[in-house]
Design a protein with these regions (language model features):
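N-terminal secretory signal peptides that target proteins for export/translocation
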Residues: 1-2
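Sequence context surrounding c-type heme c attachment/ligation sites in exported
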Residues: 5, 19-133
Length: 133
């Protein structure tokens, strides 16, 4: 009986370890880098660039829209760091800078701080220009 209990415990432990190992692996990339850039990052950068031309967000709705756009840019940049997408250190550095800039834009939008918003947007653009010269 003790051997059976020990065997059952070991079997459960093995199953738990296999399940944990499966969950720790990275999910597969679904969209291509081009799709992410064209469908997620670029349209949202266009929204922020248009606001920048007007001197920054001008209304409560603009501030909300800029926060939303920055969040999608930041998340898109996070997706660029997926192991199947990383090309080199410059790629990683550019994505990380874009994430940091997008987070700064979001924080500035929360405070409705135009100067900080512009600085965050500049940082986001610098991250993008790491690859897009």
């Amino acid at each position: 009986m003790k051997k059976l209990s020990l065997f059952a415990c070991l079997a459960l432990l093995g199953a738990a370890l296999l399940t944990a190992a499966h969950h720790e692996s990275s999910p597969k990339a679904v969209a291509s880098v081009h799709d992410l850039m064209e469908d997620v990052v670029k349209p949202n950068m266009d929204v922020l660039a248009a606001m920048k031309k007007r001197g920054g967000p001008q209304s409560e709705q603009d501030w909300k829209k800029s926060k939303s756009a920055a969040s999608l840019i930041g998340e898109g940049a996070q997706l660029m760091l997926h192991p199947e997408r990383v090309k080199d250190e410059a790629w990683t550095g550019g994505a990380e800078k874009s994430i940091e800039g997008a987070a700064a834009v979001m924080a500035a939008a929360e405070k409705q701080d135009t100067e900080a918003w512009m600085a965050g947007l500049t940082m986001t653009g610098q991250g993008c220009r790491t690859c897009h010269k």
